[in-house]
Amino acid sequence: MNSLDNLLEGMTFDFFGSGKHKIEMETLLATKDAIFLDVRSRPEWESIQIKLEHHIKVLWIPIEEIPARRDEIPRDQTVGVFCSAGTRSTIVYAYLRSIGYEDVRIAPSNYDALTSLLLPGKLHKAIATRKAQQEGE
């Protein structure tokens, strides 16, 4: 039996019911040392680049490059996988889990969930929180 078989066997009703496979965008952006893994295509990325400089680190690795570049994805941090529709993020989630990544989650796959957190009031709060964390270190 291979690792993908093992992964699928663990995807029971309880697993999906608990929501262990996903993470809300607000939670992801507030998670210290988390990674926002953007798996969208080059044309999508060239149209809308997601930086999140005041929140968390962003890695842009198109889905087709994930196998060759998987060592760039930290294993010791929460990884929130993002795409614009949900299909690619789900595939990358399953792939990373099947090769031993433990703390991988599927982020909401739409721009509205992301941009609603970047309005001035919420962005100001994120900047203040990040500054306080840095001063406390």
Model-inferred region functions:
Residues 1-34, 39-78, 87-137:
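Rhodanese-like catalytic fold shared by cysteine-dependent sulfurtransferases
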Residues 81-83:
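Short, surface-exposed ligand- or partner-binding patches at beta-edge/loop junctions that are enriched
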